[in-house]
Curated annotation (Swiss-Prot):
One GO CC annotation: Slx1-Slx4 complex
Main location: nucleus
InterPro entries linked: Structure-sp_endonuc_su_Slx4 (IPR018574)
Name of the protein in its database record: Structure-specific endonuclease subunit slx4
Subunit structure of this chain's protein: Forms a heterodimer with slx1.
Keyword DNA repair: yes
Keywords: DNA damage, DNA recombination, DNA repair, Nucleus, Phosphoprotein
Function statement: Regulatory subunit of the slx1-slx4 structure-specific endonuclease that resolves DNA secondary structures generated during DNA repair and recombination. Has endonuclease activity towards branched DNA substrates, introducing single-strand cuts in duplex DNA close to junctions with ss-DNA. Has a preference for stem-loop (SL) and splayed arm Y structures. Introduces a single-strand cut in duplex DNA on the 3' side of a double-strand/single-strand junction with respect to the single-strand moving 3' to 5' away from the junction.
Entry similarity comment: Belongs to the SLX4 family.
């Protein structure tokens, strides 16, 4: 490959949006290209990802190189880490090639003609320039970590494949002090990655619930803070939970106490009514006869000369009033059974009459002699007694009243001794 063809990695965010444009490079140079191609398909988190674009331009004017970490964060040359000479490994220099296509097979098996033919000296010179850049260690750590957090929080869900590999990839780039700047959230993710391969939890659900139900904010915050993914002390969370439980139980106790007090007041009123009734019965004996007569007449009873009968009448009236008032208070008011039974009997009688009329009509129409049917068509009178006997011979026993109602319904002329 000529020296005019160069390698450039753009810093625009559109370059890293498509998965087909991302390539994973195994850091081995001194091997056959076929062996490199066979081992080139690796996990995204285990090595750097570099976007290579070839074009014909001045080779000396292009000194820009961008590394891409496992989560898709771009860092320019002036933001990269200052790698120490002890940590810099000349054997693990990446094999750079510039074969790009929409097809995945083209990416995994690049053409040898398009592969970049740069020796170790050129790569060492580029890495030495990156190494000599000042004040880039902390810049890379903060930019790599915080931009990752921003991209994740904007999508609403935090998803990462094996966070412990993310830490390894950062250490390959020289980020050994990431432990100091890492929040407890990433620590929890790294610890949970040992048991589960994928870690996923929602960030925006709490905000949505608080917007829908503002009154439930305190309970939501207490429950969310008790999760292992969020920051805080477990003891304080338990304390908040117990406080919420105490508040709930106190409110519930107050409601129950109010209902009990109301029920007690209701029972007191009933007891007072019973005591008043008993006191009235005791006072009836001391009432004069004229007053007892007035009370009995007020209830609609006839007056009597004997005081004992008047007392019994008044007592029975008072007992009836007390029982009725208690049944109303308890919701056991006596239903009007006689109305229900009467309506049921009426409906049953109507059904019987209609069924009997239908049976008579079927027998008349299906008879072989057609004597009754001919009389009906010629408007000749039918003897009711003879018609009743004729129906009995057809296995239909019907009373005279039902026969008369059938004749009245269908306009059949009748004759008989009942006139």
């Amino acid at each position: 490959m000529s020296a005019e063809e160069y390698i450039e990695v753009s810093s625009s965010p559109d370059i890293f949006t498509d998965d087909d444009d991302m390539i994973t490079i195994e850091p081995e140079l001194n091997k056959n290209p076929k062996d490199c191609n066979s081992k080139r398909k690796r996990s995204v988190t285990e090595c750097c990802e570099i976007r290579l674009i070839t074009s014909k331009c001045d080779f000396e004017s292009t000194q820009q190189l961008v590394h891409h970490n496992c989560t898709g964060h771009k860092v320019h040359e002036h933001n990269l880490n200052a790698v120490d000479e002890e940590d810099f490994d000349t054997e693990n220099l990446p094999l750079l090639f510039s074969s790009f296509s929409d097809n995945e097979s083209d990416i995994l098996e690049p053409d040898l003609n398009t592969r970049v033919a740069e020796d170790n000296d050129v790569l060492l010179s580029r890495y030495s320039k990156i190494k000599n850049s000042a004040s880039c260690r902390n810049t890379f750590e903060h930019s790599a970590y915080h931009s990752n957090r921003e991209e994740i929080s904007s999508s609403g869900f935090y998803y990462h494949r094996k966070p412990q590999l993310f830490e390894k990839s950062l250490e390959k780039l020289g980020n050994k002090s990431i432990e100091a700047n890492r929040s407890p959230l990433i620590k929890e993710l790294c610890e949970s990655a040992n048991s589960t391969e994928n870690v996923c939890f929602s960030v925006s659900t709490v905000d949505e619930i608080q917007q829908r139900h503002p009154s439930a904010g305190h309970s939501i915050d207490s429950t969310c803070q008790s999760n292992s993914f969020l920051e805080g002390d477990s003891a304080t969370h338990k304390k908040k939970k117990t406080d919420n439980i105490k508040e709930f139980t106190s409110c519930e106790f107050n409601d129950r106490s109010r209902t009990l007090l109301n029920y007690a007041g209701y029972m007191d009123t009933n007891k007072n009514a019973d005591n008043e009734a008993k006191s009235l019965k005791e006072k009836l004996e001391n009432f004069p006869v004229e007053k007892l007569r007035a009370i009995a007449e007020s209830y609609g009873f006839k007056s009597s000369d004997s005081k004992a009968t008047l007392i019994k009448i008044v007592e029975s009236c008072l007992d009836a009033i007390d029982s009725r008032s208690q049944s109303k208070k308890l919701g056991k008011e006596t239903p009007h059974d006689y109305l229900i039974t009467s309506t049921k009997t009426v409906l049953e009688f109507d059904d019987i009459v209609t069924q009997t009329h239908r049976a008579i009509s079927q027998v008349v129409k299906q008879a072989k002699d057609n004597s009754v049917w001919i009389k009906i068509l010629t408007y000749s009178a039918i003897d009711v007694e003879e018609f009743q006997l004729w129906l009995k011979r057809k296995n239909l026993n019907v009373s005279l009243d039902l026969i008369k109602s059938w004749c009245d319904k269908y306009g059949v002329l009748m004759k008989g001794s009942w006139h």
